[in-house]
Amino acid sequence: MVGSRTWCESEMLFVQPDAGTKEELYYRVTPKPGQTQANFNWTPHKVRFHDARPQRDSFDLNTHGFTFVEDAISPQLIERIRADDTAAVEGDYFASVAALVKRVTGADHVVCFSPYTRKENSEKGIFGQPARTVHCDHTPAAAIELTHKLCGEDAVRLLQSRFRAFSVWRPLVEPVLDWPLAVVDGRTIAPDDLHPVHWLRYEKKDTEPPFQLSFSETQKWYYLSRQRSDEVSIVKNYDSEVVPSPRSAHCAFKHPFVPKDAPPRESIDVRCLVFGGR
């Protein structure tokens, strides 16, 4: 039964360990005939995932690079999000995410952007599915570039305060039984594990590349079993302060003990630029 064990093992896709020795890495989302999709290989590795449920409230953004927070959401808003109601996502939901992040961090200003609704077996393509590759959404340079892009003339002033970039992830169907979100203790990520990869859409280089990770035995992974819609995962992608975990990384994984009648996983994640706070 999902959630009855303290850990499980499954596979995730990592960048090959020597990827950083090659030229600038790229991945074409929809390659044309004859084009190379990528100049690196994904490598599957078996990973042990520790269930965070028994110690859910002990994880901290500064120490671990992620945290789990209870935050109520109305069934009506969930249904509007599931129906791809853009106004609901960018209006009511962005406002609730900003309020949550301010409550958790004491931040002065939060900018929400890039919402992704995901569903197992979605027809929306690769970005509508649970993410299968281990990644951190922003490199440091990309996080700063995004601030200038989204905040305009206020960027210089905002960047004088503490600056963080988060991904805020919430299930839309509960509980999550299959393809849960895994997060890694940021203290166990080595610099050599991180590889910037440009995702090419329509032959246009992504100017804000994410980090993809290579596998290391020292990495320690967690997931929250049977995660509910009122349990939100906040995952750090960047931090301007010197703290034990400057970032975490995340990925979905196929749970080995999922019931055959488990509903498809549905979720929403929103990226945030966070200024000020503790």
From Swiss-Prot:
EC numbers: 1.14.11.-
Pathway: Secondary metabolite biosynthesis; terpenoid biosynthesis
Effects seen without this gene: Completely abolishes the production of novofumigatonin, but accumulates asnovolin A.
Gene name of this polypeptide: nvfI
Function of the protein: Fe(II)/2-oxoglutarate-dependent dioxygenase; part of the gene cluster that mediates the biosynthesis of novofumigatonin, a heavily oxygenated meroterpenoid containing a unique orthoester moiety. The first step of the pathway is the synthesis of 3,5-dimethylorsellinic acid (DMOA) by the polyketide synthase nvfA via condensation of one acetyl-CoA starter unit with 3 malonyl-CoA units and 2 methylations. DMOA is then converted to farnesyl-DMOA by the farnesyltransferase nvfB.
Record field: catalytic activity: asnovolin A + 2-oxoglutarate + 2 O2 = fumigatonoid A + succinate + CO2
An example Gene Ontology molecular-function term: oxidoreductase activity
Protein name according to UniProt: Fe(II)/2-oxoglutarate-dependent dioxygenase nvfI
Top-level taxon of origin: Eukaryota
Native species: Aspergillus novofumigatus (strain IBT 16806)
Residues of the signal peptide: none
Entry's family note: Belongs to the asaB hydroxylase/desaturase family.
